[in-house]
């Protein structure tokens, strides 16, 4: 693998996706490569009265394993976990009774939703507009057909019909009321949800008096402040060609986020064809790309979530051009030849 830097003019493109579950972890030691192999154990451990020892909780939420590590009180950690459960039961497309489920089942009728649901949809629509629909949260009509757990490939006819219902312009938000103009359209917030949740959790913990925390939502890592000794958190980047414990790089992060998306996260093979979980809203099929993994360092996990998978549709060169032109991001891209490419100012350390 080689390190290369690109600096080209910006090209705007985007993609939509189902929820990703890449493993990327915070390190409380200087060597992220070593710590990546030993994530905190399930449950919460006892912390010091003054928050001098870390409190950690690990649960299966958002279709992945999440680990929250804070230097604070047990009450703050419990509040963060409860907040995660709230989002699981509000944003999930598949949880019966969730806001998104009710919107999709309403056949075009207006639906009253939580403030957070209206907010995330409003933010998501801004990405849809900026990308002229290449990022489109109404990809749910297609993503609901694919089953990457059981390895189910939809019929071509079903995909062709489903993509006719992809159009973000048919989504309206008025206060906390959401309506789809197409009765057969379906929303899928997988391309932005974990980023939004990570940013929300940081705000919640800060309000609880927590000044140091690392939130690993499985591919979306957000950190609050620095480590207790004042040094940055180190976030490891998984090797897309290795095991979940193998890392290719680490990046220091203070009060920001590192978001990684990879083709290998969910896939299956049928009749010799490999299908990836990242779907192209223009075709309804998995994206065709030379990018295997992309990682973004950014202040906003919401931005990082939306853009990390956008890079797949763009391809390596155009993706790095976009990152170099957008001062919100620094990035790392691994292509299908195994080469690692960094943005011009990327502080990633390669291993």
What label would you give each PLM region?
Residues 1-351:
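Mature catalytic core of soluble alpha/beta enzymes
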């Amino acid at each position: 693998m080689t390190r290369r830097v690109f600096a080209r003019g910006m090209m705007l493109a985007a993609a939509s996706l189902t929820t990703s579950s890449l493993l990327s972890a915070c390190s409380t030691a200087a060597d992220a490569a070593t710590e990546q192999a030993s994530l905190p154990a399930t449950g919460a451990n006892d912390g010091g009265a003054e928050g001098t020892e870390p409190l950690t909780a690990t649960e299966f939420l958002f279709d992945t394993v999440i680990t929250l590590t804070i230097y604070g009180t047990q009450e703050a950690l419990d509040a963060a976990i409860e907040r995660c459960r709230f989002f699981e039961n509000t944003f999930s497309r598949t949880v019966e009774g969730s806001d998104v489920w009710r919107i999709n089942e309403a056949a075009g009728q207006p639906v009253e939703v939580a403030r957070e649901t209206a907010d995330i949809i409003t933010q998501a629509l801004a990405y849809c507009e900026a990308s002229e629909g290449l990022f489109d949260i109404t990809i749910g009509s297609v993503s609901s057909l694919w089953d990457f757990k059981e390895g189910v490939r939809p019929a071509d006819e079903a995909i062709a019909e489903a993509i006719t219902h992809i159009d973000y312009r048919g989504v309206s938000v008025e206060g906390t009321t959401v309506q789809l103009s197409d009765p057969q359209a379906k929303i899928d917030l997988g391309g932005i949800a974990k980023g939004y949740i990570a940013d929300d959790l940081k705000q919640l913990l800060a309000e609880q008096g927590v000044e140091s925390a690392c939130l690993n939502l499985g591919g979306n890592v957000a950190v609050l402040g620095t480590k207790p000794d004042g040094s940055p958190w180190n976030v490891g980047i998984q090797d897309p060609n290795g095991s979940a414990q193998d890392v290719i790089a680490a990046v220091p992060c203070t009060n920001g986020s590192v978001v990684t998306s990879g083709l290998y996260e969910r896939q299956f093979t049928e009749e010799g064809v490999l299908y990836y979980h990242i779907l192209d809203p223009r075709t309804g099929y998995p994206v065709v790309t030379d990018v295997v993994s992309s990682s973004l360092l950014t202040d906003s996990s919401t931005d990082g979530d939306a853009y990390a998978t956008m890079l797949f549709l763009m391809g390596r060169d155009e993706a790095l051009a976009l990152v170099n032109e957008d001062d919100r991001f620094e990035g790392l891209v691994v292509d299908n030849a195994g080469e690692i490419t960094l943005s011009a100012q990327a502080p990633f350390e390669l291993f």
